[in-house]
């Protein structure tokens, strides 16, 4: 989708999208005729960022999520790289399943740790 379509679908302004791009939170998947195009991951990130912005969170504050995701991806890569080096469909499928499960577990851990860290405010 185009930047205009992404803004319309996510509720972002063009300036907000530009800020998200500047901080490396939303990336174009490809460029066609010099125009950037965005994929469904960009739409999801843009929509979630728009939701955060409604609470006064600025794009620069969201960089921590990008940094954490990059670190987590690097860690997962280390874990599944031996499977991917085997170069067979079964190992590739096992690597994908491992990443999916680790992602699910990591999401649960983050949620539990955040709840624990904020417990005094939530009770």
Language-model segments: residues:
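Arg/Lys-rich, alpha-helical DNA-contact motif
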Residues: 1-8, 14-18, 22-123
